[in-house]
Amino acid sequence: MPKLFGTDGVRGVANEDLTPELCLKIGRAAGEYLKSYGDTVLVGRDTRLSGTMLEAALSAGLASVGLKVERLGIVTTPAVAFLASREDVAGGAMISASHNPVPDNGVKFFDNKGYKLAESHEEQIENYLEKELSRPTGTDIGKVLPENNKLIENYIQELIDKYPLDLSNYKIVLDCAYGATYQIAPRLFKKLGAEIIPLHAENRGEKINVECGSTNPELTSRTVVEEGADLGFSFDGDGDRIIALDEEGNQVNGDKIMAILAKDMKSRGELKNDKLIATVMSNLGLKLALKELGIALEETKVGDRNVLNRMREQDCVLGGEQSGHIINLQDNTTGDGVLTGLKLMKVLIDTGQSLKQLASIMEELPQLLVNVKVSNKDSAINSQKVQEEKSKVEKQLGSKGRVLIRPSGTEPVIRVMVEGENRETLHEVANHLTQVIKKAAE
């Protein structure tokens, strides 16, 4: 059987790649692994139309090996991680494909400390798929409980207790991407007194991430300016990413958010080892800004799992990705868009500065990211011609530029990132590399 788990759980087109039959098997196999840590598993989902179907299958699989299933309903991925670490449970499961297109869905698991399962543990689950597993009967069969919204309220209240901010002087635009934050984010910020302008804050799984959210924050940007808001937050479909918009509608991406938070945490003596963990996709401007602050930047491969693993290895508390995954181990074990928004608001209040002023800490070098759709990622990545052209472009860009070419871990695309001083040149070289990659993948 081919490897099932990718860089962020199991993903595919729902009812085609990720079928109910497969989810049932995954539930049984994951349940066999998790039940040595407890008798209950939390299960959440985003708003995707396939979510209830896959939730039913996964829950049935978990119950069939004797586990009790506590259904959270529509909830963010970080809320599942948070609750898995707080409740007396074996772990948690989230049914979501994050920022992926509408037809996709996925399943990822968390242990009872709230961390995504390590690759070795996912391999154990895959091994269980091939084995005959226990089939309890009678009163030993697990139960699938009705949805429990109280646990979500517990999550919201714990965030408020940790950050009891007075936001009554702030007007905030919230883009919930028709996804999992559509209830949680508006409810939390309203409870703290903010005036909220919600966008895409409905349970519309057929439109999740479509021209909205953290990957498409343009409407949020315009709305901030038109409504005279102080700032805006755009989340992705499962709520683990955030892109902020300042009072003039300018994007404040993950790099700038990390710079703002790192400076604030260092000033409080909370930035362990004065170090931040980010990926190779982060802008060179982040490294330069942190150097001025006496903060070291260590880079990893792309993926929030890689960031988290390095954070734990290096005993760091802050890390993330340019895309808006921000991990702060003081508060949660995975990227949490709503929590990151709260932390940004705290810095605004404490400093009395606007988001634009705070974001000026970092000057970005022009950077261009192109997603090249291909049918064969391996042939493109391993192509000698692609590597030769990449080297030529790197020489052309010089010491203040760089090129990254890598396969997506979740989509059939090759990501090309070029960075340098001249945007026109970047477009030229990106277009050139795109054509070379497409030809190599034929």
From Swiss-Prot:
Keywords: Isomerase, Magnesium, Metal-binding, Phosphoprotein. One of its GO terms (molecular function) is magnesium ion binding. InterPro entries: A-D-PHexomutase_a/b/a-I, A-D-PHexomutase_a/b/a-I/II/III, A-D-PHexomutase_a/b/a-II, A-D-PHexomutase_a/b/a-III, A-D-PHexomutase_C, A-D-PHexomutase_C_sf, Alpha-D-phosphohexomutase_SF, GlmM_bact. Mg(2+) binds at S98, D236, D238, D240. The modification Phosphoserine is found at S98. Binds 1 Mg(2+) ion per subunit. GO terms for cellular component: cytosol. This is Phosphoglucosamine mutase. It comes from Natranaerobius thermophilus (strain ATCC BAA-1301 / DSM 18059 / JW/NM-WN-LF). The gene is glmM.
